[in-house]
A protein has these predicted regions:
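Outer-envelope beta-barrel architecture signal
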Residues: 34-36, 61-63, 72-74, 100-102, ...
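Flexible, surface-exposed loop regions and adjacent strand-edge segments
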Residues: 3-12, 55-60, 93-98, 135-143
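Gram-negative outer-membrane beta-barrel transporters
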Residues: 7, 11-89, 127
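Short acidic/His/Gly/Ser-rich catalytic and metal-binding motifs that mark active-site loops
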Residues: 1-4, 129-131
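C-terminal beta-signal and adjacent terminal beta-strands/loops
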Residues: 87-88, 108-157
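Intrinsically disordered, low-complexity regulatory regions of eukaryotic regulatory proteins
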Residues: 1, 23, 101, 154-156
């Protein structure tokens, strides 16, 4: 950001530069038993300008664990995702606190005539964390929504 605002939104100035990127992405999936599956994953990127300094809006280290159950017509899962603090920031960019998201869902599949329907309940951000996504242009003014719950039916015709 240039510290200049127009209609209450920050004005940005971009210029091209050579960068050095290092990172990793890993995923481990374990079918614990027939209905249960555990997934562990993580990713990280380190982005620096070739002449020194950090690239703006670089995502922080992220790690996640998901336990899923699927048997016959029933599916359920619970996922915890931890986003670490991002303090490797560019000039005029603010650091972002880390946060943990906890999401869960359960669904039941059934047939109605020739259509297959799925009834579900899902919850996102169950711990009602204040979430500011470091890669967002509006992170300092607009957090993600808090806890949400949804109940629905999805159909294939």
């Amino acid at each position: 950001s240039t510290d200049v605002h127009e209609d209450e939104l920050p004005v940005y100035l971009f210029s091209a530069a050579e960068v050095i990127l290092h990172g990793f992405e890993a995923q481990f999936v374990w079918q614990m038993s027939d209905p249960f599956k555990l997934t562990l994953q993580g990713d990280y990127i380190r982005a620096r300008l070739n002449g020194g300094g950090d690239l703006p809006r670089t995502p922080p280290l992220r790690v996640a664990a998901e336990l899923a159950y699927e048997q016959d017509a029933i599916s359920a899962d619970m996922r915890a995702t931890r986003y670490m603090q991002q303090d490797k920031t560019a000039a005029l960019e603010t650091a972002t606190d880390g946060y943990t998201l906890l999401d869960a869902s359960i669904s039941y599949r059934f047939n109605l005539g020739t259509s297959q329907l799925t009834a579900y309940v899902k919850g996102q951000n169950l711990t009602d964390e204040e979430v500011r996504v470091h890669t967002s242009f509006l992170k300092d003014s607009t957090p993600l929504p808090g806890r949400s719950m949804a109940l629905g039916v999805r159909g294939s015709f």
